[in-house]
Regions:
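Thiol-based oxidoreductase modules, predominantly thioredoxin-like and allied folds used
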Residues: 28-41
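Glycine-/small-residue-rich active-site loops that bind phosphorylated ligands and cofactors
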Residues: 13, 36, 64
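Structural micro-motif
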Residues: 48-57
Length: 78
């Protein structure tokens, strides 16, 4: 089973799309709202050249920034 963490914001449509996509696939994940967690926001900036790209998704240690559904599916499948 893939370990998935989604770093995003509640108001962000791309974040919400990714959450719905994973729900449809039945993939469990941890969602971290970077607007309420400065340490997580810092982690996102470190992995995105100083930008808070939402969503930034970590799948089994691999970091994806604003991935397409296909990119996310491929990362989950390994």
């Amino acid at each position: 089973m893939s370990k998935v963490k989604i770093y995003g914001a509640d108001w962000c449509e791309d974040t919400q799309h990714a959450l719905r996509h994973l729900d449809r696939l039945g993939v469990s994940y941890d969602y971290i709202n970077i607007e309420q967690n400065e340490e997580a926001a810092r982690w996102v900036r470190e992995h995105n050249d100083g930008k808070e790209r939402k969503p930034t998704i970590e799948v089994n240690g691999r970091v994806l920034s604003v991935p397409s559904d296909e990119e996310l599916d491929a990362a989950i499948k390994g």
